């Protein structure tokens, strides 16, 4: 079984058989580093699972690029505005490296939800996870120590440092790139 399927099942408490049923109804897409799934002001109401790569959700705030979330192998991504309300996205979703996604239209996914209580419950749990993730991001942004926020991110997503420019990680952590550099310096193993 592919590693991303295992991660997906664990993250969203979905039995493997149901995740495979979901994947059977999805189409595989390939993206290059810098490609967008949707740009701020654009529309995309589809639902995706990351099978390879890292993605970033971000927006511009008075000309400053602010990272809202990162997603990697086994995680779901979608434009909340496009998926829920079929309106323009307030967030751009960008590939941080060459990536693969499995995608399904909202209409097709809702047919699957209607035919399976377990899949419908998965949809509910997914949105609960999204809300918790957003709230956590907002709260940790107020955490008194940049180092603590950085260590938490490293624990949850260690692969980000390999693919995501430090300026994007810094904006996600609500710190300057200089503060992030200090965090990297203080947390890296000291030479012997």
Name what the model sees in each region.
Residues 1-27:
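Cyclic nucleotide-binding regulatory module and flanking cytosolic helices
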Residues 1-4, 30, 105, 146:
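N-terminal alpha-helical segment
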Residues 8, 31-37:
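Amphipathic, Lys/Arg- and hydrophobic-enriched alpha-helical face
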Residues 29-31, 71:
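Hydrophobic residues at beta-strand termini and immediately following loops
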Residues 36-97:
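Cyclic nucleotide-binding regulatory domains
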Residues 94-177:
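Polybasic "coupling" helices that flank or enter modular domains
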Residues 186-191:
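Conserved small/polar residues in nucleotide/adenosyl-binding loops
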